[in-house]
Amino acid sequence: MAAAAPSRVSVRAAAPGQTGGFAKIRPQVVVAAAARSAGVSGRRARSVRASLFSPKPATPKDARPAKVQEMFVYEINERDRESPAYLRLSAKQTENALGDLVPFTNKLYSGSLDKRLGISAGICILIQHVPERNGDRYEAIYSFYFGDYGHISVQGPYLTYEESYLAVTGGSGVFEGAYGQVKLNQIVFPFKIFYTFYLKGIPDLPRELLCTPVPPSPTVEPTPAAKATEPHACLNNFTN
């Protein structure tokens, strides 16, 4: 006759004085152990079901500041840096046409015209010549540099015959994470432009960058101190 398979239930040896080779296992001990095992398995199953079917946590909202901050800047071409440089790359050599490139850089002043801020630097790609408006439409990609405060980058339509709005695509320094838009007001193309920035996503701007602007007109000029970049009339480490 085949020997019976050994039981999976472990048993302990009989204590001295007990009869038989093994001690008897009390049924209630086995039942209690099985109940504990079933309880653990049940809790695990409930946890798995909860993780599978419970709603996902909501995506946290954008924590960046939503307040709109205005900043005013004048861009003035003082004809001292061979800007703009017009590169005729289109097939039409007698008039402005699609594909012409215009790299440029000009000086930046505060909206109050009493402080030198830095420079603009970028490129315009001619998209359309508009003879009935005696002007052109460009796609512009450029940056505004503000010394130790960092820079702002923008992109969008640059119209030589009327105002336009460009997107603020980012920045560095105090402008890191900035977004919003900037209104470009052509005063005298390509020599005087007035910008109104509507910035979001950043902490409060430094007081040095805030001002009450001089109303734009063809006759506006920076103060002599700002033009001479005297220490009290320019940003620290401004780009020249």
Curated annotation (Swiss-Prot):
Disruption phenotype: In cpm2 and hebiba mutants, impaired jasmonic acid biosynthesis. Flower morphological abnormalities and early flowering. Slight increased susceptibility to incompatible strains of the blast fungus Magnaporthe grisea with higher hyphal growth and impaired phytoalexins (e.g. sakuranetin) production. However, normal sensitivity to compatible strains of M.grisea. Impaired jasmonic acid accumulation in response to wounding. Its EC number is 5.3.99.6. Gene3D superfamilies: Allene oxide cyclase-like. It comes from the Eukaryota. Keywords: Auxin signaling pathway, Chloroplast, Isomerase, Lipid biosynthesis, Lipid metabolism, Plant defense, Plastid, Transit peptide. Pfam families: Allene_ox_cyc (PF06351). It is found in: Plastid, Chloroplast. It catalyses: (9Z,13S,15Z)-12,13-epoxyoctadeca-9,11,15-trienoate = (9S,13S,15Z)-12-oxophyto-10,15-dienoate. It is an enzyme of class 5 (isomerase). GO terms for cellular component: chloroplast. One of its GO terms (biological process) is developmental vegetative growth. The keyword Lipid metabolism applies. Induction: By wounding and jasmonic acid (JA). Up-regulated transiently by salicylic acid (SA), ethylene (ET), abscisic acid (ABA), and hydrogen peroxide H(2)O(2). Also triggered by chitosan (CT, a fungal elicitor), heavy metals (e.g. copper Cu, cadmium Cd and mercury Hg) and protein phosphatase (PP) inhibitors (e.g. cantharidin CN, endothall EN and okadaic acid OA). Accumulates at lower levels in darkness than in light conditions. Follows a circadian rhythm. Induced by brown planthopper (BPH, Nilaparvata lugens). GO terms for molecular function: allene-oxide cyclase activity. Pathway: Lipid metabolism; polyunsaturated fatty acid biosynthesis. Expressed in leaf sheath, flag leaf, first leaf and, at high levels, in panicles. The keyword Metal-binding does not apply. Residues 1-49 form a transit peptide. Involved in the production of 12-oxo-phytodienoic acid (OPDA), a precursor of jasmonic acid (JA). Required for the production of JA in response to wounding. Necessary for flower and coleoptile development regulation by light, including blue (BL), red (RL) and far red (FR) lights. Involved in the auxin-mediated signaling pathway leading to growth stimulation. Essential for photodestruction of phyA upon activation by RL and FR. Implicated in responses to salt stress (NaCl). Confers resistance to incompatible strains of the blast fungus Magnaporthe grisea, jasmonic acid (JA) thus playing a significant role in the resistance to fungal infection. Implicated in riboflavin-induced resistance to the sheath blight Rhizoctonia solani. Required for Pseudomonas fluorescens WCS374r-mediated JA-dependent induced systemic resistance (ISR) against M.oryzae. Belongs to the allene oxide cyclase family. 'Hebiba' means snake leaf in Japanese. This is Allene oxide cyclase, chloroplastic. It comes from Oryza sativa subsp. japonica.
